[in-house]
Amino acid sequence: MGLLRGGLPCARAMARLGAVRSHYCALLLAAALAVCAFYYLGSGRETFSSATKRLKEARAGAPAAPSPPALELARGSVAPAPGAKAKSLEGGGAGPVDYHLLMMFTKAEHNAALQAKARVALRSLLRLAKFEAHEVLNLHFVSEEASREVAKGLLRELLPPAAGFKCKVIFHDVAVLTDKLFPIVEAMQKHFSAGLGTYYSDSIFFLSVAMHQIMPKEILQIIQLDLDLKFKTNIRELFEEFDSFLPGAIIGIAREMQPVYRHTFWQFRHENPQTRVGGPPPEGLPGFNSGVMLLNLEAMRQSPLYSRLLEPAQVQQLADKYHFRGHLGDQDFFTMIGMEHPKLFHVLDCTWNRQLCTWWRDHGYSDVFEAYFRCEGHVKIYHGNCNTPIPED
C-alpha cells in the first residue's frame, strides 16, 4: 500500500455530500471517508500509557477518552480461517476478538540489513494472514522514535490493499519499557548476557520474561516474534496452539535446533553423564529457541512457581546448580528453568520455528549436529538465525 498524499480527496468527498442522493454516490462517500480515516489513523502515535488507559476504560464500561490513534486498517470481511474459534479475550459475549503479536524493532534507521529482514517478515506475515470479520490483528512494535517512523513506512508499503481483515499497530517506547523491566530482570542479566554494552546486556531483551508484568492486564495472550522470520502459513493458526497448553504450561516455544546448550551445559553434563540436559531430541533436552514464543500472560500472572523463579535467589541457585553462563538473554533463562520445570512449557513443533543456522556444525559438533538440526514436516515459519539466508518461494 502506498503512502496517502493528503486530505484533499476527503474534503472533496465531504463537499459533495449535500448534492449526492443516489445509493451509488453514497457508497462512494463511504469509501472516501474510509480513506480519510486511514490517513488520520496512520499518522498518529499511541503510547504504552495511553493504550493501557484506553483498555482499562473499555473493560470498565466507561467511554474511552480520546487517545492518539494507532495505525489501523479495516478491510471488511473474510472467510473464517480453518479451525478458527471465536473467543473473547475479555471473557464477555460476542464482539471484537484481539490477537496480539509483538516484535522488537530498534536501531533500524540506518540498518539496511535489519530493514530488509523486517520487510521479508512483515510481507510474508501480512500476505498470508486470514482473520474473521470480528477479529483484529494487533501488531505491537517496541522501538525508539526513529525506528518507529521506519516501521510506519514499511507497514504502509506492505499492508495489502485487499487484506480482508482488521489490523491495528501499537508502538511501545523502548526506553519506557526498559525502565520498567530493569528492576525485574537486573539480577538475571549477569547470568544470561554477553557483557556490558553488548546486544543482550540490555534489559529490553528480557522483555518476554516479564511481559506479564509490563503489558496491560486486559491482554491475556501474546506471541513474540523475531524479525528474521519468513511465514509460510496463516499466522492465525499459530494462535490455536494456545488451546493445546496443558495445565501449568505458561509459554509455548520450540526446541533449539543446534547443540548450543550441549556446549553451555558441558560441565553439568560432565558431572552427570546420564543426564538428558543438553542432549538431542526426542529423549534429550536441547533447550529452547526464542525466535517464536507464545506467552500466556494470564497464566504467567497466576503461576506461583513462575513468580518464584523470577526471584534473584532462585535464579542464582539454578545458575549455580547447572554451572550456567549464557549470552542469549530470555532464551537462556527459559532454557535453564525448563531443565528444572519442563511442565511450564508447551513445546512447539519444529516446523513453527525452523531454524536455519548451522554455525555449531563447523565449530566442534559436526558428529552430533544432525540429531539436533533434523526437522520433518511442512515448514510453517522459517527462522534465518545468525544471518542465514531464508529459502526463496
Swiss-Prot record:
Record text on cofactor binding: Has the highest in vitro activity with 20 mM Mn(2+), a concentration entirely out of the physiological range. Can also utilize Mg(2+), suggesting this may be the physiological cofactor.
Membrane topology term: Single-pass type II membrane protein
Subcellular location: Endoplasmic reticulum membrane
Cofactor(s) recorded in Swiss-Prot or TrEMBL: Mg(2+); Mn(2+)
Keywords of this entry: Disulfide bond, Endoplasmic reticulum, Glycosyltransferase, Magnesium, Manganese, Membrane, Metal-binding, Signal-anchor, Transferase, Transmembrane, Transmembrane helix
Family: Belongs to the glycosyltransferase 8 family.
Cited function: Alpha-1,3-xylosyltransferase, which elongates the O-linked xylose-glucose disaccharide attached to EGF-like repeats in the extracellular domain of target proteins by catalyzing the addition of the second xylose. Known targets include Notch proteins and coagulation factors, such as F9.
Name listed for the protein in its UniProt record: Xyloside xylosyltransferase 1
Organism: Homo sapiens (Human)
Organism ancestry: Eukaryota, Metazoa, Chordata, Craniata, Vertebrata
